[in-house]
Amino acid sequence: MQVVKRDGKLVDFDQSKIRVAIEKANREVRPRERATKDEINQIIDYVEDLDKKRILVEDIQDIIEETLKKDKYDDVLENFANYRENRSKARETFTDDKRSHKFLKTLEGLALKSAAEDDAKRENGNIDGNSAMGTMLQFGSNVSREFSKAYLMKKKFADAHDEGYIHIHDMDFEAMGTTTCMQIDLDKLFKNGFSTGHGHLREPNDIMSYSALAAIAIQSNQNDQHGGQSIPAFDYYLAPGVLKTFKKMLKTTIKDYIDLEDLNDFVNVASIEKEIAKINTIDITVDYFEKFYKTSDLMKRLFEMSIKKSLEKTDKRTYQAMEAFVHNLNTMHSRAGAQVPFSSINFGTDTSSEGRMVTKNYMLASEAGLGHGETPIFPISIFKVKEGVNYNPEDPNYDLFKLSLRVSAKRLFPNWSFLDSSFNKPYYKAGDFRTEVGYMGCRTRVIGNVVDPDKQITPGRGNLSFTSINLPRIGIKHGIVGKNALDKADMKGFYEELDELM
């Protein structure tokens, strides 16, 4: 017996192909629901016993499906049918002359034209379409997109996308199964350290290290998904770095003054350092060290100057850390060197002196701009506004809110998130910054939790990709404008088509 393939070629019947196809479908179901070897052999025997010299490959597949259905192997049948459909779509994708021509023209444009000449190279504003890695990424994206349409979705969805009725965002990442945007919980990463896959990073102990690791966390996460990376409470997460830096500066400054005044024989430096280790805020006064100076005016002045200088040094170092953070996120590469990380940060509600110092210096660094004064594209910054925190003149962070207005007037960022709005306020719990709504790079917010209402928080949350519907197209089609305009809008037809697309 010979088998007629879809292209008309004749090949000898090969029973192993039936066996392999059914066994592939078997692998996807539980063992007790799989077609047995005897059942597979019966199908093979049935085909071989047919009194035919030639048989179409589609007829063999129909026989397999009918037998699986008759013997109640429903899950195996579903897997086999899906495999058959995917193979059919793949053949159509790569044998359809019109589609193949369009695909090859796209690749031709990527290879032979500049971004100024080719729209495909400008599809993503965060990718330099003229760079080697940018072009390589777009080659891969186009191939992956065609693979997704051929193997991972029904033909009607792929056709609707190609015809412009819908737009399936990030289709080139469909095959990878990655998430879109994510709110990174830096607290977990900082406390235990983390690995980027090429080595483990220890817990940071200075505001410079905190800002560097925050940028690295964003860059690393960018390589694990296709969307944007966001930090939901930047000020809260980096505040401990300010305190650690202050304590380090205070130890060094006091020791330097003691050396300068030649007081090492009269002062127990180790005891002073133990007291500094207990400090839990940068808001300390000279009274904290009273037991060390007692009646010595010289020692009292020494501690006063040390506290003042340490605060100044910490503030300056925090500014430098924020400046480095902004520059890093606008220069460090991710995704094979084709993009800078698409990043967002939320801040503005930490009223501690450490958190306020982070917020203030980040906005000042953003206001200063990049090397030649350019407006930083990233990170997208969102200032969280809350009555009792920063909205009214009597609120502790009101000065930072005013600074955000000044910076945004010059740099377009920060934007503002109003925590007292009707769709944000129900989630807010005083004293728990995790319940403050934060926004991601794609401008979305995720905080509600229908599975566990006790975990309605922002850190660690994210989303999947989106599909847009071309409302103007169906509006024009059923409306009173355009070359096929109706005398009266067909609202019923509009909603019927909208329902179908949804």
What do the PLM-derived regions correspond to, one by one?
Residues 1-110:
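Charged, amphipathic alpha-helical regulatory modules used
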Residues 89, 96-502:
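Conserved catalytic cores of very large enzyme subunits
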